[in-house]
């Protein structure tokens, strides 16, 4: 994957953005597959002891906001509680799903909130949403080809 990483890092910014969007579409599909298997995703936030229900549409809204280049549907505010809960271990997902969630979160911050986020971090997280490690290289190759 090293030569692919180098290939990605040498892309112009608009092509990197395209790769990010392509890979995060896949991450979103993994998120949606997971959500479809859950009746409801909820947790207890330990600071105040409140019961929270996960907003399963938030990652899709994050992707949409990233595409548009601005925060649509108050995504930044909606992410505050679940990200804190993940960091506090109040909310847990299987590793690939957590990677998908973070990939979409970081994509949002880079392209909608215009924050500095490492380009490779988004790629790595989005690829890690794929449980089948043998597919990751092909995913990145395909995304780079489609973007250029």
What are these regions (language model features)?
Residues 1-148:
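Structured binding/interaction patches within domain cores
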């Amino acid at each position: 994957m090293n030569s692919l990483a180098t290939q990605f890092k040498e892309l112009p910014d608009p092509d990197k953005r395209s790769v990010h969007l392509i890979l995060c579409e896949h991450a979103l599909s993994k998120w949606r597959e997971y959500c479809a298997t859950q009746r409801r995703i909820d947790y207890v936030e330990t600071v105040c002891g409140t019961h929270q229900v996960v907003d399963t549409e938030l990652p899709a809204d994050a992707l949409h906001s990233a595409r548009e280049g601005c925060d649509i549907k108050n995504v930044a505010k909606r992410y505050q509680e679940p990200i804190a809960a993940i960091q506090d271990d109040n909310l847990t997902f299987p590793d690939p799903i957590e990677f998908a969630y973070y990939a979409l979160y970081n994509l949002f911050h880079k392209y909608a909130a215009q924050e500095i986020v490492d380009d490779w971090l988004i790629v790595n997280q989005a690829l890690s949403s794929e449980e089948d490690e043998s597919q990751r290289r092909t995913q990145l190759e395909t995304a780079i080809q489609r973007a250029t």
